[in-house]
Amino acid sequence: MNAQERMARGPVWRLFLSMSLPAITVMLVMVIYNMADVYFIGRAGDTAQVAALALTGPVYGAIQGLGTLLGSGGCTAAALALGGGDKRALSAVTSFCFWGALGMGALLAAVGAAFAPNICVMLGAGADSAEYAERYVRVISLGTPCVLMAGVLSNVVRADGSMRAAMLGNGLGTLINVALDPLLIEVLGMGVEGAALATVIGNAAGCALLLRHIIRKQPGFSFAPGALKGEWRRCLNVLALGLPLAVSTLLSSCAGVLNNGLLAQYGDTAIAAMGVSGKVGMLAVMIAIGICMGIQPAISFNFGRGDAKRALEISRKTAALAFAVSALLSGACYVARDGFMAAFTSDAAVIELGRAMLAISLTACPLAGAYQACTAFLQATGKASYAIALSVLRQGALYVPCMYIMNGAAGLNGLMYTGAVTDVLAFAIAIAMCIGWKRRILRGELGEESTTAAKS
């Protein structure tokens, strides 16, 4: 039974093993990837450099968000094309993702390198952390084409169920990054510049491996510019399908900038504590995202071939699994929170504040996991407008006002509770949207948006 036959008829729980497990591995790799820089910088005991990493995190997040726009949208569109047997659509989608990533990466590299000082001012870098932040932004900006392309390809390659290739590409990148971190940061004394350079080199290596896999083992995928001729509607559909997750990531980066701006009034200790606790707290949510990302092509594939019943069955089990795993991991992280914080910094003030921040953020992680499943269901079934609305609510319309209101009401303590409160509200809205959309699917009331997605 090949990958497409498994998606169509295989036992659902086995699908999670074959599709979500590799994606979970990718997410774990990304967690390690994000933690490695903080770990090696933190060992030096320089709170200013740790704060600089926290301040510049939204820059890397924004690059990943733009990669998600093409990668996640391309994965869904390609899976729908495969499910419908449309080879022309598959070629157009994959070609658009490749050239779009290349062009966008080159543009962002030029802008980021030229305006690094201005970007750091906008990020809220203070006197102690500004120089370090600028160094990081300049290097990571120049490497944007590699970072962007690696993110896009690791998503698109999953469209036909090739989860192992995505896992290997991300795994290689992380392995190289983690191996280079101590050399560049500590041995060569490059500090945050070394962290950025290791990230770029790791992404370049992962990108090369993924390109090799696509060229050799996915002949239906195309990088030919000619495949785009007269296919602008399909290209727009890729952007529409990728927009929900991209909006979520980009808004998260923007919210991070605003949050850091509010934290700056409490000093570098508060920024560093939030940065470290955020890296640890992402573990549970990232695993839930891996579950949802891994299984999403199966939902899209079945929806694209007209089997709504199976698509809904997979979606229900995805939500249950994401919630359960997030709950278990949140509990484990809560128990080990002191050890986690101490592993990343020796600053007692940062540890004390960070452990409190981590404990609060973990309370709503199970709901955040289920929220990810809701977003994946809406995106996979082509309901891009609902998924976009959810993303805007979670990271913008709910989070930002809540952040300012709670900071005004309770200061730093209020800021610490913002994420948890927003997760609860976003989950309630997501459930309501998914129930309404499920009923319409069962009644056959798909509407033009999802009908177009299924055919694209």
Each language-model region and where it sits:
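Short alpha-helical transmembrane segments in multi-pass integral membrane proteins
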Residues: 1-20, 78-145, 187-243, 299-364, ...
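N-terminal transmembrane alpha-helices
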Residues: 8-39, 43-44, 58-73, 77, ...
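Transmembrane helical elements of multi-pass membrane transporters/channels
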Residues: 18-37, 139, 173, 202-206, ...
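Residue-level hotspots within pore-lining transmembrane alpha-helices
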Residues: 25, 29, 33, 63-67, ...
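Helix-terminus/linker motif at the lipid-water interface of multi-pass membrane proteins
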Residues: 28, 32-51, 120-127, 183-190, ...
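Small-residue-rich hydrophobic transmembrane alpha-helices
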Residues: 50-110, 147-166, 260, 273-337, ...
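Hydrophobic transmembrane alpha-helices of multi-pass small-molecule transporters
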Residues: 62-65, 177-182, 207-211, 283-286, ...
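Short runs within selected transmembrane alpha-helices of multi-pass transporters and secretion channels
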Residues: 140-158, 166-174, 195-210, 289-292, ...
